[in-house]
């Protein structure tokens, strides 16, 4: 049986790239996240907006904020999210969030165990 690698997708709202751009900076601020970074890889990404309400639908569904009825409905009316794709591939999926904008009401329960 072939073992597959774990997949972690971590989004930290309002955390700037320049704060965690290298391992030493990350280790000083968030040592556990720094250890995860050392085991995998990171990408510098640029958000398409300044607001969580606009950005999260885009991150989850790879669509623009105003696509599929706008941003007020989260991902309810959007195409399949990346979470649903990895779930269909056999991965366990979990969401840990304190953000009220990532709730089931906005469709963010789609694809999570």
Model-derived segments and their meaning:
Residues 4-6, 17-113:
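Active-site-proximal alpha/beta segments of enzymes that process anionic O-linked groups
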């Amino acid at each position: 049986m072939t073992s597959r690698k774990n997949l972690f997708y971590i989004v930290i709202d309002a955390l700037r790239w320049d704060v965690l751009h290298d391992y030493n900076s990350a280790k000083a601020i968030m040592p556990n996240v720094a250890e995860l970074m050392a085991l995998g890889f990171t990408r510098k990404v640029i958000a398409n907006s300044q607001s969580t309400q606009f950005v999260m639908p885009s991150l989850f569904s790879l669509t623009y904020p105003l696509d599929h009825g706008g941003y007020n409905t989260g991902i309810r009316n959007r195409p399949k999210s990346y979470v649903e794709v990895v779930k269909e591939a056999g991965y366990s999926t979990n969401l840990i969030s304190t953000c009220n904008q990532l709730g089931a009401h906005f469709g963010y329960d789609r694809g999570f165990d």
